[in-house]
Protein backbone atom coordinates (compact mmCIF):
# COMPACT_ATOMS: atom_id res chain seq x y z
CA UNK A 1 0.00 0.00 0.00
CA UNK A 2 1.25 3.46 -0.78
CA UNK A 3 1.78 5.91 2.00
CA UNK A 4 -0.70 8.76 2.33
CA UNK A 5 -1.39 8.81 -1.37
CA UNK A 6 2.24 8.93 -2.41
CA UNK A 7 3.23 6.77 -5.31
CA UNK A 8 6.37 4.72 -5.52
CA UNK A 9 6.18 3.00 -2.18
CA UNK A 10 7.11 4.27 1.25
CA UNK A 11 10.82 4.87 0.93
CA UNK A 12 12.75 8.12 0.81
CA UNK A 13 11.11 8.94 -2.49
CA UNK A 14 7.78 9.34 -0.80
CA UNK A 15 8.51 12.85 0.36
CA UNK A 16 6.04 14.89 2.35
CA UNK A 17 2.52 13.59 2.67
CA UNK A 18 1.01 16.43 4.72
CA UNK A 19 -2.40 17.32 3.34
CA UNK A 20 -2.33 14.29 1.07
CA UNK A 21 -2.75 12.05 4.05
CA UNK A 22 -6.36 12.98 4.57
CA UNK A 23 -6.92 11.00 7.71
CA UNK A 24 -5.66 8.25 9.93
CA UNK A 25 -7.90 5.40 8.94
CA UNK A 26 -6.76 2.10 7.53
CA UNK A 27 -6.70 3.68 4.07
CA UNK A 28 -3.97 6.11 5.03
CA UNK A 29 -0.77 4.38 6.03
CA UNK A 30 -0.01 0.86 7.01
CA UNK A 31 1.71 0.63 10.41
CA UNK A 32 5.16 0.02 8.95
CA UNK A 33 4.96 2.85 6.44
CA UNK A 34 5.85 6.44 7.20
CA UNK A 35 6.47 9.53 5.12
CA UNK A 36 8.88 12.02 6.65
CA UNK A 37 8.36 14.41 8.29
CA UNK A 38 4.76 13.39 8.77
CA UNK A 39 3.72 11.12 11.59
CA UNK A 40 2.49 7.81 10.34
CA UNK A 41 -1.06 6.81 10.93
CA UNK A 42 -1.94 3.52 12.53
CA UNK A 43 -5.50 2.27 12.27
CA UNK A 44 -6.03 2.72 16.01
CA UNK A 45 -5.38 6.45 15.73
CA UNK A 46 -8.53 8.39 14.97
CA UNK A 47 -7.03 11.82 14.40
CA UNK A 48 -8.28 13.70 11.36
CA UNK A 49 -4.78 14.73 10.38
CA UNK A 50 -1.47 13.27 11.38
CA UNK A 51 0.40 16.55 11.35
CA UNK A 52 4.14 16.87 11.69
CA UNK A 53 5.75 15.10 14.58
CA UNK A 54 9.04 13.89 13.20
CA UNK A 55 8.47 10.20 13.46
CA UNK A 56 9.81 7.79 10.90
CA UNK A 57 8.99 4.35 12.23
CA UNK A 58 5.40 3.79 11.33
CA UNK A 59 3.82 5.28 14.42
CA UNK A 60 5.88 3.24 16.86
CA UNK A 61 9.10 5.19 17.07
CA UNK A 62 9.56 8.66 18.50
CA UNK A 63 6.24 9.49 16.97
CA UNK A 64 3.93 6.82 18.25
CA UNK A 65 4.72 6.19 21.88
CA UNK A 66 4.79 2.83 23.57
CA UNK A 67 1.36 1.83 22.33
CA UNK A 68 1.89 2.85 18.71
CA UNK A 69 -1.25 4.92 18.63
CA UNK A 70 -0.91 8.67 18.96
CA UNK A 71 1.54 8.67 21.85
CA UNK A 72 3.79 11.68 21.93
CA UNK A 73 2.16 13.37 18.93
CA UNK A 74 1.40 16.04 21.49
CA UNK A 75 -1.99 15.56 23.06
CA UNK A 76 -3.99 17.11 20.22
CA UNK A 77 -4.23 14.06 18.01
CA UNK A 78 -6.37 10.99 18.47
CA UNK A 79 -9.54 12.41 19.94
CA UNK A 80 -8.26 12.75 23.49
CA UNK A 81 -7.02 16.29 23.39
CA UNK A 82 -4.53 17.50 25.95
CA UNK A 83 -7.11 16.98 28.66
CA UNK A 84 -10.29 15.17 27.73
CA UNK A 85 -9.08 11.62 27.55
CA UNK A 86 -12.01 10.25 25.66
CA UNK A 87 -9.68 7.68 24.17
CA UNK A 88 -7.30 7.04 26.99
CA UNK A 89 -5.46 4.08 25.61
CA UNK A 90 -3.54 6.75 23.77
CA UNK A 91 -2.70 9.39 26.33
CA UNK A 92 -1.29 9.29 29.84
CA UNK A 93 -1.65 10.88 32.25
CA UNK A 94 -5.17 12.21 31.76
CA UNK A 95 -6.84 15.24 33.19
CA UNK A 96 -9.56 15.02 35.74
CA UNK A 97 -13.10 15.95 34.94
CA UNK A 98 -14.54 18.93 36.73
CA UNK A 99 -15.15 18.25 40.37
CA UNK A 100 -12.06 16.19 40.93
CA UNK A 101 -8.89 17.57 42.45
CA UNK A 102 -5.68 18.05 40.51
CA UNK A 103 -4.07 15.19 42.42
CA UNK A 104 -6.53 12.77 40.83
CA UNK A 105 -5.79 10.78 37.69
CA UNK A 106 -2.07 11.52 37.59
CA UNK A 107 -1.04 7.89 37.42
CA UNK A 108 0.09 5.81 34.49
CA UNK A 109 -3.47 4.55 34.12
CA UNK A 110 -5.74 6.67 32.05
CA UNK A 111 -9.43 5.94 31.82
CA UNK A 112 -12.04 8.50 30.82
CA UNK A 113 -11.96 10.40 34.08
CA UNK A 114 -12.40 10.68 37.81
CA UNK A 115 -15.91 9.30 37.68
CA UNK A 116 -14.36 5.91 37.09
CA UNK A 117 -12.86 4.56 40.28
CA UNK A 118 -10.24 2.53 38.48
CA UNK A 119 -8.73 5.71 37.06
CA UNK A 120 -7.79 7.78 40.05
CA UNK A 121 -5.31 7.25 42.83
CA UNK A 122 -5.51 8.88 45.26
CA UNK A 123 -8.97 10.45 45.01
CA UNK A 124 -10.38 13.61 46.49
CA UNK A 125 -12.80 13.50 49.37
CA UNK A 126 -16.37 14.55 48.90
CA UNK A 127 -17.64 17.47 50.90
CA UNK A 128 -18.10 16.60 54.53
CA UNK A 129 -15.08 14.36 54.80
CA UNK A 130 -11.73 15.53 56.10
CA UNK A 131 -8.59 15.76 54.00
CA UNK A 132 -7.16 12.68 55.72
CA UNK A 133 -9.87 10.55 54.11
CA UNK A 134 -9.35 8.75 50.81
CA UNK A 135 -5.60 9.25 50.63
CA UNK A 136 -4.78 5.62 49.98
CA UNK A 137 -3.94 3.86 46.76
CA UNK A 138 -7.57 2.77 46.47
CA UNK A 139 -9.89 5.17 44.77
CA UNK A 140 -13.62 4.77 44.63
CA UNK A 141 -15.69 7.81 43.71
CA UNK A 142 -15.34 9.41 47.11
CA UNK A 143 -15.68 9.38 50.88
CA UNK A 144 -19.28 8.28 50.72
CA UNK A 145 -18.03 4.80 49.91
CA UNK A 146 -16.60 3.19 53.01
CA UNK A 147 -14.26 0.93 51.10
CA UNK A 148 -12.45 4.00 49.81
CA UNK A 149 -11.32 5.70 52.96
CA UNK A 150 -8.77 4.60 55.50
CA UNK A 151 -8.64 5.94 58.08
CA UNK A 152 -12.07 7.53 58.07
CA UNK A 153 -13.26 10.71 59.68
CA UNK A 154 -15.37 10.56 62.78
CA UNK A 155 -18.75 12.21 62.79
CA UNK A 156 -19.46 14.85 65.38
CA UNK A 157 -19.93 13.37 68.83
CA UNK A 158 -17.24 10.74 68.53
CA UNK A 159 -13.77 11.15 69.93
CA UNK A 160 -10.72 11.63 67.74
CA UNK A 161 -9.35 8.22 68.69
CA UNK A 162 -12.40 6.55 67.15
CA UNK A 163 -12.29 5.10 63.66
CA UNK A 164 -8.56 5.47 63.17
CA UNK A 165 -8.04 1.88 62.12
CA UNK A 166 -7.83 0.26 58.73
CA UNK A 167 -11.57 -0.39 58.89
CA UNK A 168 -13.71 2.37 57.53
CA UNK A 169 -17.47 2.39 57.36
CA UNK A 170 -19.23 5.64 56.52
CA UNK A 171 -18.61 7.16 59.94
CA UNK A 172 -18.76 6.90 63.70
CA UNK A 173 -22.52 6.68 63.68
CA UNK A 174 -21.98 3.03 62.84
CA UNK A 175 -20.52 1.29 65.86
CA UNK A 176 -18.96 -1.42 63.72
CA UNK A 177 -16.66 1.22 62.28
CA UNK A 178 -14.72 2.05 65.38
CA UNK A 179 -11.93 -0.11 66.75
CA UNK A 180 -11.90 0.30 69.65
CA UNK A 181 -15.37 1.75 70.15
CA UNK A 182 -14.30 4.76 72.13
CA UNK A 183 -17.59 6.53 72.52
CA UNK A 184 -21.31 6.05 72.77
CA UNK A 185 -22.23 6.04 69.13
CA UNK A 186 -25.82 6.61 68.25
CA UNK A 187 -27.05 3.92 65.90
UniProtKB/Swiss-Prot annotation:
Please verify whether the record's keywords include Transmembrane helix.
no
Q: Record's superkingdom?
A: Eukaryota
According to UniProt, the tissues expressing it are described as: Restricted to hair root, not detected in any other tissues. Expressed in cuticle layers of differentiating hair follicles.
Q: Where are the transmembrane segments?
A: none
User: Which UniProt keywords are listed?
Assistant: Keratin, Repeat
GO CC aspect terms: cytosol; intermediate filament
* Stretch list, region 9 X 4 AA repeats of C-C-X-P: 28-180
Q: Where are the sequence repeats?
A: 28-31, 34-37, 40-43, 109-112, 119-122, 138-141, 148-151, 167-170, 177-180
Which function does this protein serve? In the hair cortex, hair keratin intermediate filaments are embedded in an interfilamentous matrix, consisting of hair keratin-associated protein (KRTAP), which are essential for the formation of a rigid and resistant hair shaft through their extensive disulfide bond cross-linking with abundant cysteine residues of hair keratins. The matrix proteins include the high-sulfur and high-glycine-tyrosine keratins.
Family from the record: Belongs to the KRTAP type 5 family.
Q: What is this protein called?
A: Keratin-associated protein 5-8
Organism, scientific name: Homo sapiens
Amino acid sequence: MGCCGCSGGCGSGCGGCGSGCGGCGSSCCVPICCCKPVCCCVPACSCSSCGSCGGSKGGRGSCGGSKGDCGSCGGSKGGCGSCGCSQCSCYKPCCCSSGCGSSCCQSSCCKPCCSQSSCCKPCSCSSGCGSSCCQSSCCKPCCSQSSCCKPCCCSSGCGSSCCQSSCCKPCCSQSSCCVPICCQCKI
